[in-house]
């Protein structure tokens, strides 16, 4: 049995080699010839699964994507050909939420505001948007949710109309899939008309899919130079990046928002376990068992946390400025976008760190943000 896997999928070779012969190749450049005599295909979002890719897939029975998004896969085509498909919904939600939170904490420091004075509008209330809302509201921040499809399906959460959210939110963060048809298409959801409505003191973050924002219109909006802030982890035509847009962005990164080590391990193990079930195999993987020990496993707090403490704690684990600096330094080199993703550092999630302190430290909200917490009277570092 041959299993073709994106070479950037962590832990995949060790896991899938238990089931058959593993072939590793760059996901973005897979061709139809690569799928000859292949039984299973394991990919990430850079691989487009379509009729052209499957033209010579004479034995393919299973496709798994170790990502939450699925817009890169023609699922109707797979159903037509009798090929089983699975994804990893929610695998990256923690990493994306922590990316957004890092952006907020750094911008608050740079622009001189408190995150607790800002209203965050979350467009897209799926796995990522919902988790982000839970984290932010858990520490006392005000959140607005917008998701017309979920609202129409009877989701009982409180939703805000897009027009209202755009007016009331200080921060607008995007977490939708990319859709081009239907009643609520998200392609160019944030277009020139909407961008012109946004105030100079508002912040726009896109960590969803590049084409959700019209990048040409965004560039024109930022060129007005009125203080409007935009952050992009995804670009409309990635891996190509508009070099005129780049210097106008507060932060820019190469589609790595969800690239926490835990998230990547979850994605790989989710599709591995699904493939084992498909085969009727007894093998099973737990993502926690794959992870190394955190560099800073425990931090002791001597007093109740405040915003500055929160900034310090979160930046110990992840500071978006590190990725932004590397992106701007290296993006001009050939193939840099994919190389930065391929060789991305072992970023951890907040859950890798335990915060310890007395009852007067009020650690419960930090647990909602994702940290492990331990109430104790003495330092136990």
From Swiss-Prot:
<dbReference type="Pfam" id="PF00389">
    <property type="entry name" value="2-Hacid_dh"/>
</dbReference>
<keyword id="KW-0963">Cytoplasm</keyword>
<dbReference type="InterPro" id="IPR038251">
    <property type="entry name" value="PdxB_dimer_sf"/>
</dbReference>
<dbReference type="InterPro" id="IPR020921">
    <property type="entry name" value="Erythronate-4-P_DHase"/>
</dbReference>
<feature type="binding site">
    <location>
        <position position="45"/>
    </location>
    <ligand>
        <name>substrate</name>
    </ligand>
</feature>
<comment type="similarity">
    <text>Belongs to the D-isomer specific 2-hydroxyacid dehydrogenase family. PdxB subfamily.</text>
</comment>
<dbReference type="GO" id="GO:0005829">
    <property type="term" value="C:cytosol"/>
</dbReference>
<comment type="pathway">
    <text>Cofactor biosynthesis; pyridoxine 5'-phosphate biosynthesis; pyridoxine 5'-phosphate from D-erythrose 4-phosphate: step 2/5.</text>
</comment>
<comment type="subunit">
    <text>Homodimer.</text>
</comment>
<feature type="active site" description="Proton donor">
    <location>
        <position position="255"/>
    </location>
</feature>
<dbReference type="InterPro" id="IPR024531">
    <property type="entry name" value="Erythronate-4-P_DHase_dimer"/>
</dbReference>
<dbReference type="GO" id="GO:0033711">
    <property type="term" value="F:4-phosphoerythronate dehydrogenase activity"/>
</dbReference>
<dbReference type="InterPro" id="IPR036291">
    <property type="entry name" value="NAD(P)-bd_dom_sf"/>
</dbReference>
<feature type="binding site">
    <location>
        <position position="233"/>
    </location>
    <ligand>
        <name>NAD(+)</name>
    </ligand>
</feature>
<feature type="binding site">
    <location>
        <position position="176"/>
    </location>
    <ligand>
        <name>NAD(+)</name>
    </ligand>
</feature>
<protein>
    <recommendedName>
        <fullName>Erythronate-4-phosphate dehydrogenase</fullName>
        <ecNumber>1.1.1.290</ecNumber>
    </recommendedName>
</protein>
<dbReference type="Pfam" id="PF11890">
    <property type="entry name" value="DUF3410"/>
</dbReference>
<feature type="binding site">
    <location>
        <position position="258"/>
    </location>
    <ligand>
        <name>NAD(+)</name>
    </ligand>
</feature>
<comment type="function">
    <text>Catalyzes the oxidation of erythronate-4-phosphate to 3-hydroxy-2-oxo-4-phosphonooxybutanoate.</text>
</comment>
<feature type="binding site">
    <location>
        <position position="67"/>
    </location>
    <ligand>
        <name>substrate</name>
    </ligand>
</feature>
<keyword id="KW-0664">Pyridoxine biosynthesis</keyword>
<dbReference type="Pfam" id="PF02826">
    <property type="entry name" value="2-Hacid_dh_C"/>
</dbReference>
<feature type="active site">
    <location>
        <position position="238"/>
    </location>
</feature>
<feature type="binding site">
    <location>
        <begin position="127"/>
        <end position="128"/>
    </location>
    <ligand>
        <name>NAD(+)</name>
    </ligand>
</feature>
<dbReference type="GO" id="GO:0036001">
    <property type="term" value="P:'de novo' pyridoxal 5'-phosphate biosynthetic process"/>
</dbReference>
<dbReference type="InterPro" id="IPR050223">
    <property type="entry name" value="D-isomer_2-hydroxyacid_DH"/>
</dbReference>
<keyword id="KW-0520">NAD</keyword>
<dbReference type="GO" id="GO:0008615">
    <property type="term" value="P:pyridoxine biosynthetic process"/>
</dbReference>
<dbReference type="InterPro" id="IPR006140">
    <property type="entry name" value="D-isomer_DH_NAD-bd"/>
</dbReference>
<feature type="binding site">
    <location>
        <position position="259"/>
    </location>
    <ligand>
        <name>substrate</name>
    </ligand>
</feature>
<dbReference type="InterPro" id="IPR029753">
    <property type="entry name" value="D-isomer_DH_CS"/>
</dbReference>
<keyword id="KW-0560">Oxidoreductase</keyword>
<feature type="active site">
    <location>
        <position position="209"/>
    </location>
</feature>
<dbReference type="GO" id="GO:0046983">
    <property type="term" value="F:protein dimerization activity"/>
</dbReference>
<feature type="binding site">
    <location>
        <position position="147"/>
    </location>
    <ligand>
        <name>NAD(+)</name>
    </ligand>
</feature>
<dbReference type="InterPro" id="IPR006139">
    <property type="entry name" value="D-isomer_2_OHA_DH_cat_dom"/>
</dbReference>
<dbReference type="GO" id="GO:0051287">
    <property type="term" value="F:NAD binding"/>
</dbReference>
